[in-house]
């Protein structure tokens, strides 16, 4: 019996450690998992999300999937929505002070988070909390007590604060308070483990520090997951950078975006996003190297897996069929944006109004480069007028517009 528990704990710890950059307090995590398998006693893990954007992308899911792994091994997840701290704005990695959100924006975005996380997390083992529950009650005396727990000198050790201080870029006192408030969340929740990205290390360690300072009998472990690179393979996945794959993307878009990553980045996505074991992934890599498995097929399988997870197997297979139809067989897609106009229209103007070109200047350049087709015939004249009827305008391989001229 004891031997069987030890094996299960070892397997759990291998799963937990997969793809993780750093774990502080791994022995404590192992003791919690072992306790669960011996007695069934659960433990508390948490990760905070400031709802500054309404949609999750795959970069967020690296952390959320790790939380789901913990749920399999005895954890109750607290998905903490930082509605209070979002009205301050986390300065992590920023060179300028961020504008706070209104309460209405925060609550609207928080609802969107809740709708999405249960695509990954087990609802029966997840608690959604808002940190306004305790931070609004902190009061002046509580805030003074909290700020007395940490020095300005220690705060300036944080990399982004240090850089801004040396460059004489303004740092507001509110921004100093942010990591203290995030750390206080761990005190209020008495969390056993906290998750975050590698860029959050300072704030995560603040939780451990404050748990000690407030006399808690526990000191949370900290687990840091890597930052997922975006589609460009260089910068971190970010909606503002446009290099993201959103959890709520349409199946066709999600599938196509996964296929657009480089062969090298594909393996990074496999490690951090796929449900396949590391042994299975290593076998795939060996098969690709030996020529037994084409990189394109490996990428298609990854795109199918990810699209199925956030939609359905049927949606994923239809997305693959649509992609093959448009990009492999050079056929017209089943669905595309549509623009209706009255009277003939200049092609460049139609491209802009239909949303397949940002400007008439860019439309001209695309035509001159030979990238524009009408009804699968290359456009030669940048001054072409389109008259009565239906015209399928194509820019490159990915952009289509159905133009109906009345």
From Swiss-Prot:
Its main location: cytoplasm. GO terms for biological process: tyrosyl-tRNA aminoacylation. A motif ('KMSKS' region) lies at residues 236-240. Signal peptide: none annotated. GO terms for cellular component: cytosol. Gene3D superfamilies: HUPs, RNA-binding S4 domain, Tyrosyl-Transfer RNA Synthetase. This is Tyrosine--tRNA ligase.
């Amino acid at each position: 019996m004891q031997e069987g528990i030890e094996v299960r704990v070892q397997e759990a710890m291998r799963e937990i450690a997969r793809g993780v950059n750093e774990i502080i307090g791994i022995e404590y995590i192992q003791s919690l998992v072992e306790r669960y398998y011996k007695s069934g006693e659960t433990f508390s893990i948490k990760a905070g999300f400031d709802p500054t954007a309404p949609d999750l992308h795959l970069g967020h899911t690296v952390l959320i999937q790790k939380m789901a792994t913990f749920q399999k091994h005895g954890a109750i997840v607290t998905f903490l929505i930082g509605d209070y701290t979002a009205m301050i704005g986390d300065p992590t990695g920023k060179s300028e002070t961020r504008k706070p959100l209104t309460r209405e924006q925060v609550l609207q975005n928080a609802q969107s988070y809740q709708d999405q996380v249960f695509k990954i997390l087990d609802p029966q083992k997840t608690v959604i909390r808002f940190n306004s529950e305790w931070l609004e009650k902190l009061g002046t005396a509580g805030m003074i007590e909290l700020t007395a727990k940490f020095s300005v000198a220690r705060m300036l050790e944080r990399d982004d604060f240090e850089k801004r201080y040396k460059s004489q870029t303004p740092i507001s006192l509110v921004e100093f308070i942010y990591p203290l408030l995030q750390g206080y969340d761990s005190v209020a929740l008495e969390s056993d483990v906290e998750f975050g990205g590698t860029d959050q290390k300072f704030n995560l360690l603040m939780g451990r520090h404050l748990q000690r300072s407030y006399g808690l009998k526990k000191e949370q472990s900290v687990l840091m997951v890597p930052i997922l690179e975006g589609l460009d393979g260089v910068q971190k996945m970010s909606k503002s950078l446009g290099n993201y794959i959103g959890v709520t993307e349409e199946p066709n878009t999600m599938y196509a975006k996964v296929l657009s990553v480089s062969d090298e980045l594909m393996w990074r996505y496999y490690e951090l996003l796929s449900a396949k074991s590391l042994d299975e992934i290593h076998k795939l890599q060996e098969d690709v190297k030996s020529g037994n498995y084409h990189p394109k097929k490996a990428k298609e399988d990854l795109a199918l897996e990810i699209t199925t997870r956030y939609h359905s197997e049927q949606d994923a297979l239809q997305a693959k069929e649509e992609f093959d139809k448009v990009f492999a067989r050079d056929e017209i897609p089943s669905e595309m944006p549509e623009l209706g106009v009255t009277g003939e229209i200049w092609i460049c103007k139609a491209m802009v109004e239909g949303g397949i070109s940002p400007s008439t200047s860019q439309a001209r350049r695309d035509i001159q480069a030979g990238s524009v087709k009408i009804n699968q015939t290359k456009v030669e004249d940048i001054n072409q007028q389109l008259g009565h009827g239906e015209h399928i305008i194509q820019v490159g391989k990915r952009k289509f517009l159905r133009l109906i001229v009345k």
